[in-house]
């Protein structure tokens, strides 16, 4: 966990290197039993510039991958937007590459993610991470359904 794990208020900032990408501070509440976080609530996120278009097709799927220390996953670029976060005490170094045509093509952004941070990744931006902690539960909310027949549309860089 980062030093400011329990001190954040819900906030968002745009990532200058990759247009449309957003980084969120997520409040985490802890006591002697452990901790709790509200990972995502649409009504609270929309006023913070979370794109309403994320919900336009009425499809939502939440996935969680579990990985061990030093595992490197990615880079994946699927045909959907995603909101990613860490769901446990783990930490990752997240990395993104803009694969969309235009001035930001090839731009890269990296940051460390723990449970107190969320990232909105627009479609066309490749997403990957390396596990820094012993284990991690990496959660991603996407706005389309994964299907084997669509796998040719997915890019693995």
Please report, for each region that a protein language model flagged, where it lies by residue:
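Conserved metal-binding segment of the jelly-roll/cupin
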Residues: 112-134
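Non-catalytic, conserved peripheral segments adjacent to functional cores
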Residues: 2-113, 133-135, 142-157
């Amino acid at each position: 966990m980062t030093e400011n794990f329990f001190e954040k208020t819900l906030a968002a900032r745009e990532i200058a290197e990759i247009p449309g990408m957003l980084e969120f501070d997520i409040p985490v509440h802890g006591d002697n039993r452990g901790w709790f976080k509200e990972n995502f609530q649409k009504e609270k996120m929309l006023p913070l510039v979370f794109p309403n278009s994320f919900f336009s097709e009425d499809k939502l799927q939440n996935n969680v991958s579990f990985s061990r220390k030093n595992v490197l996953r990615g880079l994946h670029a699927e045909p959907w937007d995603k909101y990613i976060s860490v769901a446990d005490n783990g930490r990752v170094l997240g990395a993104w590459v803009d694969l969309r045509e235009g001035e930001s093509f090839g731009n890269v952004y990296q940051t460390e993610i723990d449970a107190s941070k969320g990232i909105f990744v627009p479609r066309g931006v490749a997403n990957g991470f390396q596990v820094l902690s012993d284990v991690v539960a990496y959660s991603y909310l996407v706005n389309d359904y994964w299907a084997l027949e669509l796998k040719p549309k997915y890019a693995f860089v």
